[in-house]
């Protein structure tokens, strides 16, 4: 089976499954995001080991997996994740590293990469937060909100690839990602703007009773597109340092979790923040 065939089969299965999971939300979404966060943390720690770092893998993976579940528990009023709890977690990691490994176990760098991995992989929690945004009334509205930044991230990727292959001449940041061009970045941004305007008009307004002004939609698309490209470059930088082509081979034809979600992890927190300020209710 060719690489392209595997990609197509995976996409055909993953797309409707993703929509269904986001639509039904609740524990199903929290558990899926928890698994994704755990796998993303594992991939990041795997790359870190290639550079000589010694992350606390079992603890880091477990904590990353707990974050989406904690957000779900917070929505249900069962538990509230506080800053004090996060600080206590970091101190506990540091203390356990010193106790188990001693100074030779690089406690400072071990804790630093572990905490970074937990927080980075834990960004999957923002998908859950956007699904249950304060302005989203009902499953359809929450699902429409989640897939707005998802679609813009995809549009940025497609636009950057297409315009880069067709018109690309000036390299964007060759030391990080030699294949990316300025023309591709601009093309990705332009396609994201077009898709955002269409999505707001034909999906968000009728199905979520929410909208954005034209200026708001353009601003949102620009910020999301820049964030998506930054996230992609950030993971390219990490992979370059680790000397690996893919973060793993978990997804058939697509590499690893971080290879597919690197842009979206940067986008989701920003999307949640911006939509809270730009969304407008549409009267029925």
Task: Please provide the spans of the model-predicted regions.
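Juxtamembrane boundary at the C-terminal end of a transmembrane helix
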Residues: 273-284
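Membrane-embedded alpha-helical segments of transport systems
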Residues: 156, 186-187, 258-268
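Acidic, glycine-rich loop-and-beta core segments that form the ion-binding/anion-interacting portion
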Residues: 235
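Transmembrane alpha-helix interface/packing and boundary motifs in multi-pass membrane proteins
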Residues: 223-228
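Membrane-embedded alpha-helical bundles of polytopic integral membrane proteins
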Residues: 1-222
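Hydrophobic residues in alpha-helical membrane-spanning segments
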Residues: 17, 69, 253, 268-270
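Interfacial loop-to-transmembrane junctions
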Residues: 240-264
């Amino acid at each position: 089976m060719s690489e392209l065939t595997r990609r197509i089969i995976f996409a055909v299965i993953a797309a409707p499954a993703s929509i269904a999971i986001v639509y039904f939300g609740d524990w199903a979404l929290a558990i899926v995001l928890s698994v994704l966060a755990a796998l993303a943390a594992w991939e990041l720690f795997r790359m870190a080991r290639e550079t000589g770092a010694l992350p606390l893998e079992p603890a880091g993976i477990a904590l990353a997996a707990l974050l989406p579940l904690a957000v779900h528990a917070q929505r249900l009023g069962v538990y509230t994740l506080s800053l004090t709890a996060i600080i206590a977690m970091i101190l506990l990691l540091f203390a356990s590293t010193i106790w188990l490994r001693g100074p030779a176990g690089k406690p400072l760098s071990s804790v630093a990469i572990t905490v970074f991995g937990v927080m980075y992989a834990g960004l999957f929690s923002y998908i859950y937060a956007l699904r249950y945004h304060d302005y989203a009334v009902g499953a359809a509205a929450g699902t429409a909100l989640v897939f707005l930044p998802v679609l813009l991230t995809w549009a940025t990727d497609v636009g950057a690839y297409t315009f880069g292959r067709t018109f690309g001449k000036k390299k964007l940041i060759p030391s990080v990602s030699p294949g990316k061009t300025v023309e591709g970045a601009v093309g990705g941004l332009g396609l994201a703007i077009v898709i955002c305007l269409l999505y707001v008009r034909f999906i968000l307004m009728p199905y979520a009773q929410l909208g954005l002004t034209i200026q708001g939609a353009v601003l949102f698309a620009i910020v999301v597109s820049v964030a998506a490209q930054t996230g992609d470059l950030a993971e390219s930088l990490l992979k370059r340092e680790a000397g690996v082509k893919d973060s793993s081979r978990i997804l058939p034809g697509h590499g690893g979790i971080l290879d597919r979600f690197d842009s979206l992890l940067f986008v989701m927190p920003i999307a949640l923040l911006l939509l809270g300020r730009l969304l407008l209710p549409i009267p029925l």
